[in-house]
Amino acid sequence: MIKNRCLDIDLETKEKVLIVDDEASIRKILETRLSMIGYFVVTASDGEEALNLFHQEMPDVVILDIMMPKLDGYGVCQEIRKDSDVPIIMLTALGDVADRITGLELGADDYVVKPFSPKELEARIRAVLRRTNKAAFSSHLTTSGIINFNFLTIDLNKRQIYKDNERIRLTGMEFSLLELLISRSGQPFSRADILQEVWGYTPERHVDTRVVDVHISRLRAKLETDPSNPDLILTARGTGYLFQRITDQHVLKT
C-alpha cells in the first residue's frame, strides 16, 4: 500500500482514489499524477489486496485493472458491488469490445483502454466524482422529489429507490442516468445525448454507444418487474431511450 502524504493539506478533506494494477510502473505514474492534482492515493497490486484496501480505506473512486493475479478485475468489481456503489473505472488492455462490456455489465461505471493518456483518465475521474457528489437533482414536477409508481418509489432528493418497499442499490452513474431520463419523462434521449450528459463524452470522441445500452439493461434489471418487457424505461426505436411520462398521479405532493 502506498499513500501520498502532504503536511499542508488535511487528508480527510481530499478525495481518495484506489488504484489497482499489477504493473508497478502504471501504479507509480498514476499515483504521482493524481497526488499532484490533489487526490489522496492508495494502491494495490492484485485483486485480493485491492479488496482488503477497499474495506480499510473506503475510497471515493476505484481505478481497476482487469488482468491481475489472484483475483482479476471482474471478480473485484463483483465483490465491491455487493455492498457499495462507489464509482469504478476499469483499465483494460483487451481489444475485444465484448470484454469491455463485460466490465460494465458487472457494475463498472466507465472504462479506459490501455495504452491511455493519464490526462484522459484524470478527466474520467473528475466526471464520475462530479456526478457522484453533485447536488441532489431537483424535479420540476415536485418539491418533495418523490415519485411513486405501483411498485416503485424514487426519492430524487435522497437519491434512493425502493422496489416493493425494498431498497434498491444503484451506482452513482446509474442514478445519474435515471435522473436524466426522468428530467424529460416521456421524451426520448438519443444515445449520443446520454453519453454527453451522463459521461461527458462529446460526439467527436466516437465512443461505443453500447455503453449506454449496457447501463440501460442494468437499470431495467434492477427496476422493472419484467426487464424484457419494460414499463418504465422504454426504447424509442431509431432514437434511444425514454422514461415513461410522469403525471400528477405519480407525484407525492408536499
From Swiss-Prot:
One of its GO terms (molecular function) is transcription cis-regulatory region binding. Its main location: plastid. The modification 4-aspartylphosphate is found at residue 65. One of its GO terms (cellular component) is protein-DNA complex. PROSITE patterns: OMPR_PHOB, RESPONSE_REGULATORY. It is found in: Plastid, Chloroplast. InterPro entries: CheY-like_superfamily, OmpR/PhoB-type_DNA-bd, Sig_transdc_resp-reg_receiver, WalR-like, WH-like_DNA-bd_sf. Keywords: Chloroplast, DNA-binding, Phosphoprotein, Plastid, Transcription, Transcription regulation, Two-component regulatory system. PANTHER family: OMPR SUBFAMILY (PTHR48111:SF65), REGULATOR OF RPOS (PTHR48111). NCBIfam families: ResRegRpaBCyano. This is Probable transcriptional regulator ycf27.
